[in-house]
């Protein structure tokens, strides 16, 4: 029975050792030796004695095995790998000894990146996609400019002022009350064709009433009708006067011949 327990413990310790080598974790077997007082470090250098770590008692043994305390010693070679596994892949930590050994024996496996700032294109050069530069002289540089005459700007301002004045005059004309043409209506009624003159006079009064009420649309309509009738009355009256005069002259001339 003791032989079976020892074989199982040896297998367990070998598996732990192999797992430590594969995963880069702490090796607890290769650098310790058993003695009467327990596990003792086999490092000859005194500075590694401070790396000794005393673990707590084991929770249980395989099938009723031993329960004595176990001392674990950190392996400096695998400690760096275990630390690196907690960082991202782009962060690599190396000791000074490893870097020094790289500089001495493995210098050919390293690559160096150099940043050159002298190839930046100047103001008189142009960079092509293939990395070549070409110098540009003052004659080759073309600067697109935009110019205009001051007179054009003045003409534009004049046009804007004329347009604004026209719009203001139109607004003022629309806001002005329509005229009644009362005098022209009275003249057409008394001196010209009086039926149309009377109608023009009536429409002029309707225009004044619409303006007093604030109905500018009706007032403008009445004003246009009064003006039309007054002009028509004057035209007809003038024609009548001319016809009467011609008839009178013809009559008088006929009597003289007799």
UniProtKB/Swiss-Prot annotation:
Q: Which residues form the signal peptide?
A: none
Q: Is Transmembrane among this UniProt entry's keywords? A: yes
Intramembrane parts occur at: 229-249
Q: Which GO terms describe its cellular component?
A: cell body; dendritic shaft; dendritic spine; early endosome membrane; excitatory synapse; glutamatergic synapse; plasma membrane; postsynaptic density
Q: Which GO terms describe its biological process?
A: intracellular protein transport; positive regulation of synapse assembly; regulation of postsynapse assembly; synaptic vesicle clustering
Task: Give the stretches traversing the membrane.
Answer: 182-202
Keywords (alphabetical) are: Cell membrane, Cell projection, Endosome, Membrane, Phosphoprotein, Postsynaptic cell membrane, Signal-anchor, Synapse, Transmembrane, Transmembrane helix
**Record's subcellular location:** Cell membrane; Early endosome membrane; Postsynaptic density membrane; Synapse
Instruction: Tell me which parts of the chain lie in the Extracellular compartment.
Output: 203-228, 250-258
Q: List the InterPro entries.
A: CD225/Dispanin_fam
A GO molecular function term, named singly, is: protein homodimerization activity
Please report the record's description of how this protein sits within the membrane.
Single-pass type II membrane protein
- Which protein family is it in? Belongs to the CD225/Dispanin family.
What is annotated about its quaternary structure and interactions?
Homodimer. Interacts with GRIA1 and GRIA2.
- What name does the UniProt record give this protein? Synapse differentiation-inducing gene protein 1
The gene behind this protein is Syndig1
């Amino acid at each position: 029975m003791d032989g079976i327990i020892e074989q199982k413990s040896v297998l367990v310790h070998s598996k732990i050792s192999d797992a430590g080598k594969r995963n880069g974790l702490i090796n607890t077997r290769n650098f310790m030796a058993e003695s009467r007082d327990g596990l003792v470090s086999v490092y000859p250098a005194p500075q590694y004695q401070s790396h000794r770590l005393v673990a707590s008692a084991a929770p249980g043994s395989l099938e009723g095995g031993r329960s004595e305390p176990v001392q674990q010693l950190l392996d400096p070679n695998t400690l760096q790998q275990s630390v690196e596994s907690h960082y991202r892949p782009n962060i690599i930590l190396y000791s000074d000894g490893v870097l020094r050994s790289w500089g001495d024996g493995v210098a050919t496996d390293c690559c160096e990146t150099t940043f050159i700032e002298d190839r930046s294109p100047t103001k008189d050069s142009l960079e092509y996609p293939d990395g070549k530069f070409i110098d540009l002289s003052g004659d080759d540089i073309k600067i697109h400019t935009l110019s205009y005459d001051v007179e054009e700007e003045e003409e534009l301002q004049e046009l804007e002022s004329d347009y604004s004045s026209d719009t203001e005059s139109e607004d003022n004309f629309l806001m002005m009350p329509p005229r009644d043409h009362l005098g022209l209506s009275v003249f057409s009624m008394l001196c010209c064709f009086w039926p149309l003159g009377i109608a023009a006079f009536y429409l002029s009064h309707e225009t004044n009433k619409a303006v007093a009420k604030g109905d500018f649309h009706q007032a403008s309509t009445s004003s246009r009708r009064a003006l039309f009738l007054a002009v028509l009355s004057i035209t007809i009256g003038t024609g009548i006067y001319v016809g009467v005069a011609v008839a009178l002259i013809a009559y008088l001339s006929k009597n003289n011949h007799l």
